[in-house]
Amino acid sequence: MQIRLEQLAAQLSKGLKGLYTVYGDEALLVQEALDTLREAGRKEGFTERTVHTVQGAHFDWTELLAAAQAMSLFSDRQLIEIRIPSGKPGRDGSDALQRYCDALNPDVLTLVSLPRLDKATQNSAWFQALEIGRAHV
């Protein structure tokens, strides 16, 4: 479901989804959306936050998959941010993101941030997995 930034607060008042994809070419608007989602998550008890930034081909996707399934030591619910500044996770990342979406943990709120994406990327299998039944801003 596509949500515009000005609609985000109203949408969040109806409840959080498990995964949000935030992308665009306006860095300030992307940051505002992420801040709004983080605050909504905190209010719902997602107090432990981990950030994974994908930088090149050396990112450990298995660590991300394990983090999503691990129980938190300090809180019941956790927020995981996945930042993909290049907008291209690569073949391993594509597979990992699809597996991640197939096994979403209800005690994990996931925020995926990306730059503006071209049509080919939006039609890719990994991006479609992020979209199906979820929200993107």
Feature annotation, model-predicted:
Residues 1-6, 10-13, 17-19, 27-134:
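Non-catalytic interfacial helical region
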Residues 22:
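An amphipathic, basic-hydrophobic helix/alpha-beta surface used to engage anionic
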